[in-house]
């Protein structure tokens, strides 16, 4: 954009300076990248003409997007929306930021309306994001709590390598998951939903035939909890070691350009897996029924290894299908961005506040993934 010639000081006052400058050689270039923080006001002046040929008065027309006597332009609106979603700033802080940096006189209402209108314009795009995730082979799901107008609610997340979709609902379970409109629409047997073991994900499917893969990071934390707080059981140590071994082997094979594991590795891991689970369930027996109301507690160790038994295919899916990741990292990273906003803003204003945020955040995260 700009070039500054750094010349010897003694040459600048010389009468032949310009002549020497033209024949000079570049020894080194150093760059400074900066920004110009200034607002630009464009006035649209509506003019009327009296036609000299017909004597008619002709008046110009403002552009379609010029709805009022004063308004902020698309770049300003984009900055406000980005500060709200990616910057995790409250409306009050956005107002102060914009007014300080650009010498605006922006009000709380202007900030809120800008975000709401931006979200309205972006809804068509988020429908396409929703459709793309619903048709993907592998999708990650997660949820995290939030507050709006002093009430509790839940943000539901669906994500792939290229798309991220956020939605807000008062309920955490079945109603909230279905309202997002992604999980329930994955009905192809070749599709995979990567989740934790939260029960609504396992019971919501009905007749849908998609496969379930379970997050290794969650399982590793549960196994570590047994090791640290429940007597360091051998079955937990062995299972943790086996899953780590399987993960490392898969990463090695992927690094070599392989697209699947050989039968020897599959048989080895499967055999050891079954052996560990069987030994654990034999040692930590099903509790006997008592006269007390309700089901007797199985205990943490048996409950976890029953899940290992019942959901073996989902736990080891990363080993059997290299397209399936070993963790729900994609979903958890998407949730992490929300938690930053919730910590800063604490509570969303207005009924549409969380929904507006979800639309804008979905657009920004998806755009970032596409470069």
Model-derived features: positions:
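Short, flexible loop/hinge motifs at secondary-structure junctions
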Residues: 1-68, 141
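Catalytic center-proximal scaffold of phosphoryl-transfer enzymes
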Residues: 48-50, 55-370
């Amino acid at each position: 954009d700009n070039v500054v010639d750094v010349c010897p000081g003694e040459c600048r006052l010389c009468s032949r300076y310009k002549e020497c400058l033209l024949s000079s050689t570049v020894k080194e270039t150093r760059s400074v990248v900066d920004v110009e923080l200034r607002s630009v006001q464009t006035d649209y002046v509506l003019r009327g003409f009296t036609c000299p040929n017909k004597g008619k008065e002709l008046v110009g027309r403002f552009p379609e997007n010029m709805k009022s006597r004063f308004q902020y332009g698309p770049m300003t609106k984009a900055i406000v929306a980005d500060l709200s979603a990616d910057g995790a700033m409250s409306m009050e802080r956005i107002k102060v930021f914009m007014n300080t940096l650009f010498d605006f006189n922006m009000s709380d209402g202007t900030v809120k309306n800008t975000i709401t209108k931006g979200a309205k314009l972006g809804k068509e795009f988020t429908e396409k994001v929703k459709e793309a995730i619903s048709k993907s082979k592998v999708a990650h799901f997660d949820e995290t709590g939030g507050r709006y107008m002093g009430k509790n609610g839940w943000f539901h997340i669906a994500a792939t390598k290229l798309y991220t979709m956020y939605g807000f609902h008062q309920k955490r379970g079945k109603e909230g998951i279905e309202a997002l409109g992604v999980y329930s629409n994955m009905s192809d047997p070749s599709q995979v939903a990567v989740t934790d073991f939260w029960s609504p994900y396992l019971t919501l499917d009905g007749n849908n035939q998609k496969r379930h893969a379970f997050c290794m990071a969650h399982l590793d934390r549960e196994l570590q909890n047994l090791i640290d707080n429940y007597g360091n059981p051998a079955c937990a140590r062995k299972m943790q070691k086996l899953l780590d071994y399987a993960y490392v082997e898969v990463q090695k094979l992927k690094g070599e350009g392989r697209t699947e594991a050989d039968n020897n590795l599959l048989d080895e891991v499967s055999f050891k897996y079954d052996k560990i689970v069987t030994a654990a369930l034999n040692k930590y027996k099903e509790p006997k029924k008592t006269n007390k109301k309700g089901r007797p507690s199985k205990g943490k160790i048996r409950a976890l290894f029953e899940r290992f038994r019942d959901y073996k295919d989902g736990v080891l899916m990363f080993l059997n299908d290299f397209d399936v990741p070993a963790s729900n990292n994609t979903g958890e990273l998407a949730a992490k961005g929300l938690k930053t906003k919730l910590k800063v803003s604490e509570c969303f204003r207005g009924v549409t506040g969380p929904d507006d945020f979800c639309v804008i955040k979905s657009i920004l995260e998806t755009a970032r993934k596409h470069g």
